[in-house]
C-alpha cells in the first residue's frame, strides 16, 4: 500500500509556460573569505566578492581540500582567542528563499596540521557539525541549506567545539524559487532543508548545475557521482536525447541530470542505496527518474515499488506511464522519519525484472529556531561596547540560539506565547569589564538577575534600571560606580538582593530604596565613603549630598566672579574720573598763566644751556659747521 505519494511531475506537467517567460536574474552573492579584492574563477568565471561583513578572525592563505572546492587562494579562520562564536552578518539581502552554501578550507601554515571540527548555524539554527575526515570527502567539504531569509539579513555563524579554529573558504547566498523543494504538509518559511546528499547516477561525473548549464534559479547545486551501488549490483546507462520536463519551475533541475542512470542486474534485481544519518530526525527524499533504457519502450515494461527503511512509499512506479513517455523527467518525493542511523532506499522490480534511477537527493528537515527579541539583542550589543567586553566572550550572532551555543554570561528563556527568546539574567562577575553601564540595559525588560560584581565599571548607576520591574537580584559590588543611588531603584518592588558595596557612591540613600529594603530585601551599601542616611551608614546631618555640594560650589564660584566683575567696573570708573579731572585742570585760567611762566623759564634755561654748549664746542675743537 502506498503510504504517501507526492509526484513532482504534477508540477512539471503544466510544463512551464511560467519558466518560458523571462524572469529576472536571481540574487547571488559569493564571498571569497580572506580576499582583499574581487576575483573570478574558472571554468564559469563566477564573480567572488572580496571579504566583507565578518565579526573578526584572521585572513590567511588556503589549502583547498578537494577538486570540487572553489579554486580560491585565501580563507578566514577564527582563533579561540576571538571567542567561541564568530559570524558573517550580511545585509541588504532581498526577502526570499535561498540556498546558502559554505565551503571549508585548511590554513596553509605548518602550525595548522589538522582539520578543524566546528558547528555551523544560519539565522540562529544549527545546520551542520563537521566530522573527522571531512576534508577528504567531496560532499563534506561544504555545508548547504535551503532557508527563507525574511529580515533583509543573512547571519552565518561558526561555533568552536574545542577541536581547532574554524576556517572558512567561501560563502554563497543564491536565490531559488519561493516554492523550491516544497514537500507538502509541514513545509513552509519556518523549515530549513539541510542537504545530506545529492547523487547523479551512472556514467556521469560530479558536477555543479552550472557545469550542466542549468538554470540559475536552481541554486547551482552540487551533484556527487554515484557510479555503482555495489559490485555486480547495477550497470550504467546514458543518452544524448533531449529530456522533457526537466528544467521547469520550481526546482529547475538540469537536463543533463537525467541523461545518465543506473539499472539493476539479474544478479541483484533490487537497487539499494544506504546513507548514514542522524537518528530521530525527519528527512525529505527526492528520487529522479527518466526512462532512457533502449530496451524499455512502452508502459508496463518496467514497474517497481519504492521502499524506504522497510516501508513501501510508492507502489507500481511506471516511469513511462507517469511521466508521459520516454525521455521525460519524473520526480518522486517522500518524507521519512528515521529512528536509527541509516536511511535505506530500495527499488523492488515487479515487472521487467530491473529497476532504474537517475539521481537521488536527501535533505534533513530542520525546524528553524525561534529568535531572541530584537530590542534585547540590540541592548546586549550596546552593553558589549560600553563595557568593553573582551572578544573571548564571542558575543556574535543571536545570544540564545542555536541553543547548543548560547552567549556566555547571558541567561535565556523562551516565551512560548510569543515564540521569542528573552534574556532573564546577566552573570558577568569578575570578567575584567570596564567602561560604563549604558541606559540601554533597561531594554532588557525581563531581567531577574544582574551580577556585574568585581569588575572596574565606572560612572553612575543608570536611573533607567528602575523600569526593569522583574529584577530580583542586583549586584554591582566592588566596581567604581560613583554619584548617588538613583531614587528609581525604589520602584523595583520584586528586588530581594541589592549589593552596592565597594564603590564610590555618595549622598543620602533614597528613602524609597532604604525603607523598602529594610523590610523586604537583603542589602549591602558598605565601603562607600560618601553614603549616609540608613542604619549602618553615617547620619546625613551636616553631610551634604553630592548634588548639594555641586550647588554650593557653583554658587561660591558665581559670587566670586560677580565680586571680581564689580571690582573691575569700580576701578575703570575711578580711572575715568581721575582722567577727566586732569583734563579739566589744564583748561583753567590760572593753569594757563602758570604754564606760560613755566614755559618762559624753560626757554631761558634752554638758551643759557645752548650758549654754554656752543662755547664748549669751540674750545674743544673746530666747529662741524662752516
UniProtKB/Swiss-Prot annotation:
It holds the Pfam family Malectin_like. It is a single-pass type I membrane protein. It comes from the Eukaryota. Residues 1-22 form the signal peptide. Residues 603-626 are annotated as: Disordered. GO terms for cellular component: endosome; Golgi apparatus; plasma membrane; trans-Golgi network. Its main location: membrane. Keywords: Cell membrane, Glycoprotein, Leucine-rich repeat, Membrane, Receptor, Repeat, Signal, Transmembrane, Transmembrane helix. It is found in: Cell membrane. LRR repeats lie at residues 420-444, 445-468, 470-492, 493-516. Glycans are attached at residues 61, 282, 333, 417, 451, 482, 524. Residues 571-626 are cytoplasmic. The chain crosses the membrane at residues 550-570. Residues 23-549 are extracellular. InterPro entries: Leu-rich_rpt, LRR_dom_sf, Malectin-like_Carb-bd_dom. Belongs to the RLP family. This is Receptor-like protein 4. The gene is RLP4.
